[in-house]
Regions:
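Well-ordered alpha-helical segments within folded domains of soluble proteins
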Residues: 69-86, 126-143, 180-197, 231-248, ...
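Structural helix-adjacent loops and short alpha-helical linkers that scaffold large soluble proteins
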Residues: 21-30, 85-98, 142-156, 195-209, ...
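Extended ligand-binding groove/face enriched in aromatic
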Residues: 63-67, 85-213
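Solvent-exposed beta-strand/loop surfaces of large extracellular or lumenal domains
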Residues: 440-465, 483-489
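Glycine- and aromatic-rich loop/turn segments at beta-sheet edges
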Residues: 49-68, 106-123, 151, 162-181, ...
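C-terminal beta-rich recognition modules with glycine/proline-rich loops and embedded aromatic residues
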Residues: 208, 259, 320-329, 334-421, ...
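Beta-strand-rich binding/interaction modules
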Residues: 427-447
Length: 595
């Protein structure tokens, strides 16, 4: 047996050949997810997707087609429904998907237009092109996952309409609407590249390369909300993702400038909050402001897609760490614990609000990204397999032509103990690579009870051996509660973390705190010697909380804290505060994801 540590690959532009990704995701049909990630998938299907009023809220506007602009998000809903149907294999989910697609195609006009706008308002009003682009993507996904030729035909017809009418977008559209063109048509380049790849028709790629000049797009990250909202995180990240897709077939180093710039901004320049969220009011910010409109859910979804794309391209465990932090904190905080309601923003200080409806960008992008989570757990890695996310799950696929089953058992993120059972159909040699999170210093790995080896954090740990059915890998990742120093606006305070989880204070547990604002709660002082992880099912079954002794605002001199409180997981919908004072800030550590 050969055991090695894979150091993170250099994240430099032009290092990786465009022809070969380091990692390849599995299909959603090959993975079944349990644990908290699986629970979120299930409640999003059954408590959200399946209880929507799809006829009234989503389909009716496309059948009437009398609007002068606006946005519904039906294409995003179809994208989610297609993946959920493929993943769950539940007849009622597939029936909903079929109904959405069939009814949508029935609204397509002879010239190919598909949307909600009346004649005279098509292509030239917000957000008609944006809506149409995702409708094309949804129809294309129905063809990819279910082989529906009518969906492919409708997708191509709509794409041809868009290309043929592109000149109808006014030259001064950005000035007229206050929204830059690349923001107003968010998602179209990635859709057209996918349509070209699946259909084999080069004209859709040519539209992206020539008409949209994707390779020439080079916009620095803009701080603040300026005319044209050029600093729109979702739009910027979506176009950067399209550049990564173009890079895979046309490896121009400049195509990596924007994607790498996002990572640099998030991890080196103050752009990312401790929860993984970024931006205020949908726009890039770097001051660590945690109130109000932090972390638009669309931006969160596209951060996750960017991390996944870079992880696949380079195989750097760092991107898996970013995925883990963002998913377990900001993403899951954007949904009510029962799954029914979704947030537009997920601040770490002050009250959080749910979006009032089921349509529009954030609710629909939330469903989409949750439907993609099964593809972020396991990857093909050369001749072997890589385990990226830890959650109870099962996967079945071939490795080197040999059928393989993987079963992962763990209570993660409540526990750092993980078992991964490897069962090839017959004895086969291949490498298994395990992502060791940057927070998991002192991780031990063993196979079949043999002496454990220590694995370096922040890297992939490789075990290359002949595997037999039932062979079991055991990981033990230490999960001490740690205090993490705040930055910029949060300087002089610290947040509590354990593993990938960030903790927050819900004041409802203590009457004397009921009317205190989140900012004032942050003036409480934590007793580092009191920190204790305890089970807490208030946010999720088998969840975790941290019992903490705190002193009220002032200059505490007594050894005994004034109160003992429970700090819950960041997904706690009543959480109002995340950063707190310390008597001695030297007990806090730096955030391991910030460089």
């Amino acid at each position: 047996m050969k055991i090695a540590v894979l150091l993170p690959f250099l994240a430099l532009a032009g290092v990786v050949s465009a022809q070969t990704d380091a990692l390849t995701p599995l299909n959603v049909r090959q993975v079944k997810v349990r644990g908290e990630i699986g629970r979120r998938i299930d409640i999003t299907i059954h408590n959200n997707l399946m209880v929507l009023d799809a006829d009234k809220d989503f389909l009716r506007p496309f059948e009437v087609r009398d609007q002068k602009g606006g946005y519904i998000g039906l294409g995003k809903l179809i994208l989610a429904a297609v993946r959920f149907a493929a993943y769950s294999n539940e007849p009622n989910v597939t029936a909903l998907k079929d109904r959405l697609v069939t009814r949508l195609i029935a609204t397509q006009e002879p010239d190919g237009y598909i949307g909600i706008c009346a004649r005279g308002s098509r292509m030239n009003t917000l957000w008609d092109v944006h809506e149409m682009g995702y409708l094309i993507a949804g129809l294309l996904s129905d063809y990819e996952f279910f082989g529906k030729r009518e969906s492919m035909a409708a997708a191509r017809k709509a794409a041809d309409y868009m290309i043929g009418h592109w000149s109808e977008i006014p030259a001064g559209w950005g000035e007229q609407t206050g929204v830059a063109t690349h923001v107003a048509v968010t998602g179209i380049e990635r859709t057209m590249l996918a349509l070209s790849r699946v259909s084999g028709d080069a004209k859709y790629r040519e539209f992206v390369v020539k008409q949209r000049a994707l390779a020439e797009w080079s916009l620095p990250i803009v701080i603040g909300r300026r005319p044209g909202i050029e600093g729109h995180i979702y739009a910027y990240t979506a176009r950067s993702l399209a550049q990564l897709e173009l890079y895979r077939t046309d490896p121009q180093p400049g195509l990596l400038t924007q994607p790498d710039g996002i990572i640099d901004f998030l991890t080196r320049r103050g752009g990312m909050a401790i929860t993984g969220a970024t931006g205020q009011w949908e726009i890039w910010t770097d001051d660590q402001d945690g109130r109000g409109q932090l972390g638009e859910t669309c931006a969160t979804a596209y951060q996750i897609r960017l991390y996944d794309s870079l992880l696949r391209l380079r195989g750097d465990a760092r991107f898996g760490d970013l995925l883990e932090r963002t998913i377990f904190n900001t993403l899951f905080a954007a949904q009510s614990p029962d799954g029914r309601r979704i947030r537009y923003y997920s601040p770490f200080e002050g009250p959080r609000e749910y979006h009032p409806g089921d349509t529009y960008c954030c609710p629909c992008n939330y469903r989409r990204i949750v439907a993609e989570l099964p593809e972020l757990i396991y990857y093909r890695s050369g001749s072997g397999v890589a385990v990226n996310l830890y959650t109870a799950s099962d996967a079945k696929f071939d490795v080197n032509g040999v059928p393989l089953s993987i079963r992962q058992e763990t209570a993660f993120p409540s526990s750092g103990d993980v078992t991964v059972q490897i069962s090839p159909e017959h004895p086969t040699r291949f490498p298994v690579r395990l992502r060791i999170p940057a927070w998991a210093s002192g991780t031990r790995v063993s196979v079949n009870g043999a002496a454990a080896s220590e694995a370096s954090s922040g890297s992939f740990f490789e075990i290359d051996r002949q595997w037999r059915s039932g062979d079991t890998i055991r990981l033990t990742m230490p999960m001490q509660v740690r205090l993490v120093q705040g930055r910029k606006r949060q300087s002089g305070r610290a947040a509590l973390m354990r593993g990938p989880l960030v903790f927050c204070l819900n004041p409802a547990q203590e009457k004397s705190l009921a009317n205190i604002d989140g900012a004032d709660l942050g003036r409480f002082t934590i007793d580092p010697s009191s920190l204790e992880a305890v089970q807490d099912d208030s946010v999720r079954p088998g969840g975790i909380a941290c019992r903490v002794g705190v002193w009220r605002p002032g200059y505490p001199t007594s050894d005994k804290p004034d109160l003992v409180l429970r700090f819950g997981e960041f997904a706690d919908p009543g959480g109002l505060a995340t950063y707190f004072r310390l008597r001695d800030l030297r007990v806090a550590v730096n955030d391991e994801l910030i460089h």
